[in-house]
């Protein structure tokens, strides 16, 4: 099943809902960063959460999620946009802890239960919008939920799941976000809360072949779900050799001379996707000459 996200309105517009299948997206991140199980689940959940938040944006608007906990996985940085594209990395990809008391991947142990959870939105205006909350769980889903309630002041239920196989491959990944709008009936909220308590984990549902639409039907009742949009999602990085060349020019003439004289070349690695870009000595000389021209123009 190809990865996609659905947006829905429910209960006469009093509930907004989103659900996503992201197995291929998280698999691509796992492959690119060679992550081990705990790191895969932590990075994967953050990618899925960022895609869900990104679905509330317009096409070119984008956001960054930073999870900076006190666990061995280190910081997780993920970008997403309104077109269903995401990219991200985890500082320590090689964390594989024992299963927790419930027999699940120990994401909290990898992330830590103290630290800062940050979302930065770039809506194409002069300034970005930033919100920050403490990490309350380290399980990622609960941290997204807390952020939405406190910083965005939108009561939400967010479920994120990543199922990792014994060979480190991703068996299933996905998530949902249910948002309560002003004026929602208490009986509706009670019904949804009961459903949330009864439904198996999202990753299990997706592994069993359920679609994002079916997940929402389970959570909200099929008769109440009006699907508005279906959008493909993917891991996609916008890095390029040209962009890194611009960054190399910016490091300065002395640094470029050192790369030319001592290393006779350079390699740039994108943190987000691990793509590598090689620059020959001749290319570096061209970049240095451009840096010199830029200096003279100033």
UniProtKB/Swiss-Prot annotation:
<keyword id="KW-0862">Zinc</keyword>
<dbReference type="GO" id="GO:0044183">
    <property type="term" value="F:protein folding chaperone"/>
</dbReference>
<dbReference type="InterPro" id="IPR000397">
    <property type="entry name" value="Heat_shock_Hsp33"/>
</dbReference>
<keyword id="KW-0676">Redox-active center</keyword>
<protein>
    <recommendedName>
        <fullName>33 kDa chaperonin</fullName>
    </recommendedName>
</protein>
<keyword id="KW-0963">Cytoplasm</keyword>
<dbReference type="GO" id="GO:0051082">
    <property type="term" value="F:unfolded protein binding"/>
</dbReference>
<dbReference type="InterPro" id="IPR016153">
    <property type="entry name" value="Heat_shock_Hsp33_N"/>
</dbReference>
<feature type="disulfide bond" description="Redox-active">
    <location>
        <begin position="270"/>
        <end position="273"/>
    </location>
</feature>
<comment type="function">
    <text>Redox regulated molecular chaperone. Protects both thermally unfolding and oxidatively damaged proteins from irreversible aggregation. Plays an important role in the bacterial defense system toward oxidative stress.</text>
</comment>
<dbReference type="InterPro" id="IPR016154">
    <property type="entry name" value="Heat_shock_Hsp33_C"/>
</dbReference>
<keyword id="KW-0143">Chaperone</keyword>
<dbReference type="Pfam" id="PF01430">
    <property type="entry name" value="HSP33"/>
</dbReference>
<keyword id="KW-1015">Disulfide bond</keyword>
<feature type="disulfide bond" description="Redox-active">
    <location>
        <begin position="237"/>
        <end position="239"/>
    </location>
</feature>
<dbReference type="GO" id="GO:0005737">
    <property type="term" value="C:cytoplasm"/>
</dbReference>
<dbReference type="GO" id="GO:0042026">
    <property type="term" value="P:protein refolding"/>
</dbReference>
<comment type="similarity">
    <text>Belongs to the HSP33 family.</text>
</comment>
